[in-house]
Amino acid sequence: MAGTNPRAARIAALIQRVVASSIERELHDKRLASITVTEVRVTNDLQIAKVYWTQLGHEGHEEGERKRAQQALDQAKGHLRSLVGHKAGLRLTPQLQFVFDEVPGEAHEIEDILAVAKKRDEELARVRATAQYAGDADPYKHDDEAEAEGDEFESDEE
């Protein structure tokens, strides 16, 4: 993808700017009102551009709205490609493939899991702060052994 070819990376950034601004300013489709272009990846041969998008405020939970937005993007694909070609000045304009970006939704799930884990850690820390050993500190050490150890040190010093 765009990682190995610097020209592909520049074209991907250009496509992202053009598609995002066109969705916002030129396409007057209500289905695309909350669409955000998150990333564009262009193949090294500059033939295909995958445009990753997400919906603001929905995190992918509204399946019906997501499908309607995908339909609107697919319908506007030709118009957006011609706008990209016009603004980029490329001889061959890459084909646009719109892919829903799952990363933001997954990131929210991971954040929720981490918040639960942090809350459990805090509860355990509170319990540990007031916890005491169930018995003696060392149940195998007896008083007579402690005295014998003390006597050994006294006899060595003499």
From Swiss-Prot:
Keyword match Cytoplasm: yes
Subcellular locations according to the entry: Cytoplasm
Cited SUPFAM superfamilies: Ribosome-binding factor A, RbfA
Primary localization class, coarse: cytoplasm
A GO cellular component annotation in the UniProt record: cytosol
Keyword set includes Cytoplasm: yes
Domain of life: Bacteria
UniProt keyword list: Cytoplasm, Ribosome biogenesis
Entry-linked PROSITE patterns: RBFA (PS01319)
Gene3D superfamilies according to UniProt: 3.30.300.20
Any one GO molecular-function label of the UniProt entry: ribosomal small subunit binding
Gene Ontology annotations of biological process type: maturation of SSU-rRNA
Region span, Disordered: 130-158
Biased composition (Acidic residues): 145-158
Functional description taken from the UniProt entry: One of several proteins that assist in the late maturation steps of the functional core of the 30S ribosomal subunit. Associates with free 30S ribosomal subunits (but not with 30S subunits that are part of 70S ribosomes or polysomes). Required for efficient processing of 16S rRNA. May interact with the 5'-terminal helix region of 16S rRNA.
Quaternary structure note: Monomer. Binds 30S ribosomal subunits, but not 50S ribosomal subunits or 70S ribosomes.
Family: Belongs to the RbfA family.
Protein name (Swiss-Prot/TrEMBL): Ribosome-binding factor A
Species in which this protein is naturally found: Bifidobacterium longum subsp. infantis (strain ATCC 15697 / DSM 20088 / JCM 1222 / NCTC 11817 / S12)
Name of the gene encoding the protein in the UniProt record: rbfA
